[in-house]
């Protein structure tokens, strides 16, 4: 009885606190503003064309079997319809790839926020042994021996293929072309009140109000770009040898002193090494 009373009191407190929260306390969810421009890497048609070419080029992986679209398939929302992402040979992935839709609006990249920019993420993913496992110097040599690619680099950046502009090109393609823009919801938020159904409007009201979704999924891109621990239980797949291998490999790569004892996905802690970030993950769009 005492335990039940405690639970009821706790529930009452939570309900009381939640009832004081208004959707007006959070950034509204639309419409999308113009995508932010990186002043050091502004878009041009030549840069976008080069980035698209590289995005779908299998030579950017060490095995020659993977490219960016291996994990970010355009036809499935620029992500994968599977539990885990594709991994380079010799590894398994423990996470699924976030969608690239509207990635140019994101302030945080990758589930644990380890990438400081889209430009650096493109290079990092190419070199990462788990993702594409390509030697970046070898890749630049391959690209510099491709006359068409050399011509495209020169048109886009005034230089021959190099690591920095390789990352720049892929980033500018993603940032300025993979955008929802004119979805029915976008049209609704721009004033077309017939663009979505009455049921969808009611769902939006719940999303912004009683359901409380907007507390984390707010702003035009439906994310606060922050990291949260939502109480995920440990994935039982992590007991398997191949998952233990990737957990420890990544923990060691990210400089965790306790990498040998890691048996769960630490989330944001991998980047910050701060226990306050244990099992926190980025709010997805």
Q: Model-predicted segments: where are they?
A:
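Bacterial N-terminal signal peptides
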Residues: 8-16
């Amino acid at each position: 009885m005492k335990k039940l009373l405690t639970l009821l009191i706790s529930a009452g407190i939570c309900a009381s606190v939640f009832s004081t929260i208004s959707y007006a306390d959070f950034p509204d969810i639309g419409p999308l503003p113009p995508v932010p421009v990186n002043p050091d890497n502004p878009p041009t048609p030549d840069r976008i064309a080069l980035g698209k070419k590289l995005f779908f080029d299998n030579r950017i992986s060490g095995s020659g079997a993977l490219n960016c679209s291996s994990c970010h398939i355009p036809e499935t929302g620029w992500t994968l319809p599977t539990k885990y992402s594709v991994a380079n040979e010799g590894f398994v992935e423990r996470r699924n790839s976030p969608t690239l839709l509207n990635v140019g609006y994101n302030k945080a990249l990758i589930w644990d926020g380890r990438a400081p920019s889209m430009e650096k993420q493109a290079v990092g993913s190419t070199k990462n042994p788990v993702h594409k496992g390509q030697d970046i110097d070898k890749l630049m040599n391959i690209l510099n021996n491709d006359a068409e690619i050399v011509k495209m680099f020169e048109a886009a950046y005034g230089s021959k293929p190099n690591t920095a502009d390789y990352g720049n090109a892929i980033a500018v393609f993603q940032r300025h072309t993979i955008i929802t823009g004119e979805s029915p919801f976008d049209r609704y938020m721009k004033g077309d009140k017939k663009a979505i159904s009455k049921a969808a409007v009611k769902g939006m009201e719940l999303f912004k109000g009683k359901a409380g979704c907007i507390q984390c999924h707010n702003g035009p891109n439906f994310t606060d770009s922050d990291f949260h621990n939502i109480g995920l239980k440990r994935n039982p797949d992590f007991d398997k040898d191949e998952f233990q291998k990737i957990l420890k490999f990544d923990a060691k790569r990210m400089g965790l002193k306790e990498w040998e004892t890691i048996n769960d996905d630490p989330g944001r802690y991998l980047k910050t090494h701060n226990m306050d970030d244990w099992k926190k993950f980025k709010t997805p769009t």
